[in-house]
């Protein structure tokens, strides 16, 4: 691939996978960290973590990663829930899901929707995974207050599809420090999701968090053109 996995622009001569500036922007390092796992290894680890009940919530396999230094090089290693990054590897059920999610996030940025930091990342077997930097953790690893709409509307996780966007909007108006701005952002995100075939925006995919001493709607995350990934699903919205 001749384009940067972070910004999609052409790489310069001698660069591999990411521009130097993009590495610095996403990881805060001068060299690209190593993700020394294969797709098969991540599948096995994800199953083990789910059995141990230390996985992040959601249907798509997600692994928590921590950036550390090992023998002089930066490496991303799988940890418990406290990791600063979330990794979504390829799946056998849905082809190229990481690429589709990253592209959908890029399209949101083009539409001037604020999104969480994200990138594609090459693994040891040359397959690509999707990485996002967590916004509910500080650079020191401390937890930031953040609650999703299941919590804010008092719904169990298994009932995340049994609600309405009207109810989410009312929760934004009730709890946000800038309610009019955030409910507008929420509406724009719904419109974008409909336009891009994202029919999986359930209650867990909207959250409020503490930012600069204010309670705000979080930047968008988990945006995926589900219709491309699963053409048999003809729903328009969650």
Model regions and ranges:
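Anionic ligand-binding catalytic core segments
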Residues: 1-203, 207-238
């Amino acid at each position: 691939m001749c384009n940067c996995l972070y910004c999609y622009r052409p790489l310069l001569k001698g660069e591999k996978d990411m521009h130097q500036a993009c590495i610095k922007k996403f990881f805060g390092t001068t060299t690209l960290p190593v993700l020394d796992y294969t797709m098969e290894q991540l599948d096995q680890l994800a199953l083990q973590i789910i059995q141990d009940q230390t996985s992040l919530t959601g249907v798509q396999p997600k692994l928590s990663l921590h950036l550390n230094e090992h023998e002089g090089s930066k490496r991303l290693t799988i940890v418990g829930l406290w990791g600063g990054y979330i990794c979504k590897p390829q799946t056998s059920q849905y082809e190229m899901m990481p690429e589709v999610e990253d592209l959908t996030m890029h399209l949101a940025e083009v539409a001037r929707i604020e999104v969480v930091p994200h990138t594609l990342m090459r693994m040891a077997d040359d397959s690509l995974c999707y990485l996002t930097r967590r916004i509910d953790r500080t650079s020191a690893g401390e937890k930031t207050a953040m609650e999703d709409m299941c919590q804010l509307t008092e719904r169990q996780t298994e009932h995340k599809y049994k609600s309405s966007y009207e109810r989410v909007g009312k929760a934004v108006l009730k709890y946000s420090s800038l309610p009019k701005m955030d409910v507008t952002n929420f509406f724009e995100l719904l419109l974008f999701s409909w336009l891009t075939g994202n029919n999986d925006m359930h209650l867990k995919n909207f959250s409020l968090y503490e930012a600069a001493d204010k309670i705000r709607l979080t930047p968008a995350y988990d945006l995926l053109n589900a219709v491309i990934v699963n053409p048999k699903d003809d729903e328009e919205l969650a």
